[in-house]
């Protein structure tokens, strides 16, 4: 082989081993330069997308961690709300039952008192009617016996006077006992209400203290978000 042919073969081999992207003459290979630029842009875009995904993942993990710390206090507050509702419902129900019992008891006592005194009034009225009838009969029978009639009338008037006093006394006692019963009913209801309200205040205070004890410390959230 001549020296000229050997030189041409060596030159062709060197060109075939060279990287097109590393060519020094850009004007001779513009397609290779464009492909290299696209590879650089794609790599940068992938880095940006990867960085955004990592930030979203980190933000989600932080939110999950915050939710983990916030879930127990919310659960405790919900349970305390339900307990408070049950206590209020139970207290008002007990108060209503107590008031109904007191009113029922006083109503029964009042009815019994009215029945007792009504019976006494009826008996006394029957006696008064009977005495008036007897007085009339004796007055007609003893019309001719003035002295005896006068004596009997005097005795009858005295008896009527005493029984009218008894009737008046009975009325006064009835009104007095009715007034006492009315006052005692009001006092009993007021006392029962005060007692139930005091009990309710104690329960609410205990529930408030339990809520304060169950509340998480604020410093834990400060440490979490710091």
Swiss-Prot record:
* GO terms for biological process, alphabetical: positive regulation of dendritic spine morphogenesis; positive regulation of synapse assembly
Decide whether keyword Coiled coil is in the record.
yes
UniProt biased composition (Basic and acidic residues): 8-18, 39-48, 56-65
**What keywords are annotated for this sequence in UniProt?**
Coiled coil
- Residues folding into a coiled coil are 159-210
State the family it belongs to.
Answer: Belongs to the XLR/SYCP3 family.
What InterPro entries does this protein's entry cite?
A: XLR/SYCP3, XLR/SYCP3/FAM9_dom
Task: List where Polar residues composition bias occurs.
Answer: 21-30
Q: Which residues cross the membrane?
A: none
What superkingdom heads the lineage? Eukaryota
| Organism, as annotated | Mus musculus (Mouse)
Q: Which gene encodes it?
A: Xlr3b
Q: Which segments carry the region annotation Disordered? A: 1-65
Q: What is this protein called?
A: X-linked lymphocyte-regulated protein 3B
